[in-house]
């Protein structure tokens, strides 16, 4: 081999990446998009705020349990369909909330949901996902009409009432921004959702689910109120008005305490006057005292999530209590 050929061979070897380098680059190229998709999927989940889904799942379970006690039968297709429909509307409403909070400059680097603030998702991504979920909810509602004996006008009234409320909470009128968000949540994720799940099972609208929804609605409102109390300072800076801002920190604590413990008073009345199975939700009262202490100390870190966990457990024990009640023991069933 001549000197010229030797120099040419060395030059070629220097320009070619080593095998280990090629593997590393290839692996990095493969990991990049996969990691990006994983991050984006996680951002979609975060924007949905899944920790809040107890507010929609427990009313569906309660309405279905009330229907079972009233009719002695439960259609699992209607149970699953109503759960998916309500979850889809709830998730879409959370995305609308994410979009409008970001648009109005309310979300910031310390917010629970920073998917738009950190530019993990674009606003149009959130809009498209919200439209998709609303579409899923409407498809489920159509399926429920095909299976249930409930009249179309009654199904549409309750379902689209809930859908409109989930959008108008922050979209359109924006009830959240004019101190009416608490009223919307109290009605939608309580009486309305319970009535919806009950009606698709039994085939008619009834007043009794509205009464049984009261303890659950109060517990659900506690989630929102704890969130609004925590965010009072940033909400004031953004120029929006919530009930927590209007009544101030001291009365916000009083209201939160009432929302936490009034359901237990109702359960005590039901347990002593009708059936002992209604005392099951009282098993969660230590969690309520723990939350009250945390709120009183103004340590609001994760308190909405912890209140949602209490809401889920309280709702499940409430449903179990109704299912275990002797036939005819509960009023209006």
Curated annotation (Swiss-Prot):
Alphabetical UniProt keywords: Endoplasmic reticulum, Golgi apparatus, Membrane, Menaquinone biosynthesis, Mitochondrion, Prenyltransferase, Transferase, Transmembrane, Transmembrane helix, Ubiquinone biosynthesis
GO terms, biological process: circulatory system development; endothelial cell development; menaquinone biosynthetic process; ubiquinone biosynthetic process; vitamin K biosynthetic process
GO CC, any one term: Golgi membrane
Main location: endoplasmic reticulum
Family annotation (Pfam families): UbiA (PF01040)
Location in the cell: Endoplasmic reticulum membrane; Golgi apparatus membrane; Mitochondrion membrane
Membrane topology of the entry: Multi-pass membrane protein
Protein EC: 2.5.1.-, 2.5.1.39
EC top class named in words: transferase
InterPro entries: UbiA_prenyltransferase, UbiA_sf, UBIAD1
Region called Disordered, residue ranges: 13-33
Membrane-spanning ranges: 78-98, 129-149, 155-175, 177-197, 199-219, 240-260, 265-285, 310-330
Pathway(s) of this molecule: Quinol/quinone metabolism; menaquinone biosynthesis; Cofactor biosynthesis; ubiquinone biosynthesis
Single GO molecular function: antioxidant activity
Catalytic activity: menadiol + (2E,6E,10E)-geranylgeranyl diphosphate = menaquinol-4 + diphosphate; all-trans-decaprenyl diphosphate + 4-hydroxybenzoate = 4-hydroxy-3-(all-trans-decaprenyl)benzoate + diphosphate
Domain of life of the organism encoding this protein: Eukaryota
Family: Belongs to the UbiA prenyltransferase family.
Protein task: Prenyltransferase that mediates the formation of menaquinone-4 (MK-4) and coenzyme Q10. MK-4 is a vitamin K2 isoform required for endothelial cell development. Mediates the conversion of phylloquinone (PK) into MK-4, probably by cleaving the side chain of phylloquinone (PK) to release 2-methyl-1,4-naphthoquinone (menadione; K3) and then prenylating it with geranylgeranyl pyrophosphate (GGPP) to form MK-4.
Protein name: UbiA prenyltransferase domain-containing protein 1
Organism: Gallus gallus
């Amino acid at each position: 081999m001549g000197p010229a050929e030797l120099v040419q061979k060395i030059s070629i070897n220097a320009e070619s990446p080593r095998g280990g380098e090629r593997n590393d680059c290839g692996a990095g190229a493969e990991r990049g998009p996969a990691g990006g998709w994983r991050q984006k999927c996680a951002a979609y989940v975060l924007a949905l705020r899944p920790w809040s889904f107890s507010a929609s799942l427990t009313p569906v379970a309660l309405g279905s349990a009330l229907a079972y006690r009233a009719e002695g039968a439960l259609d699992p297709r209607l149970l699953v369909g109503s759960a998916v429909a309500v979850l889809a509307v709830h998730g879409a409403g959370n995305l609308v909330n994410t979009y409008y909070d970001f648009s109005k400059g309310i979300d910031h680097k310390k917010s629970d949901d920073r998917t738009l603030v950190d530019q993990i998702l674009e606003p149009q991504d959130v809009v498209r996902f919200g439209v998709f979920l609303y579409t899923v909810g409407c498809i489920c509602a159509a399926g429920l009409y095909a299976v249930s004996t409930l009249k179309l006008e009654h199904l549409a009234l309750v379902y689209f009432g809930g859908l409109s409320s989930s959008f108008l909470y922050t979209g359109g009128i924006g009830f959240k921004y004019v101190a009416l968000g608490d009223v919307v949540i109290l009605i939608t994720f309580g009486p309305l959702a319970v009535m919806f799940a009950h009606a698709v099972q039994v085939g008619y609208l009834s007043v009794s689910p509205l009464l049984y929804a009261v303890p659950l609605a109060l517990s659900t409102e506690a989630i929102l109120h704890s969130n609004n109390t925590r965010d009072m300072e940033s909400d004031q800076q953004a120029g929006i008005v919530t009930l927590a801002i209007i009544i101030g920190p001291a009365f916000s604590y009083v209201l939160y305490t009432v929302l936490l413990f009034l359901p237990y008073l109702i359960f005590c009345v039901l347990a002593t006057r009708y059936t002992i199975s209604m005392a099951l939700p009282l098993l969660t009262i230590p969690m309520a005292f723990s939350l009250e202490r945390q709120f009183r100390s103004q340590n609001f870190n994760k308190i909405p999530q912890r209140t949602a966990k209490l809401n889920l457990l309280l709702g499940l024990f409430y449903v179990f209590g109704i299912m275990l009640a002797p036939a005819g023991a509960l009023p209006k069933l």
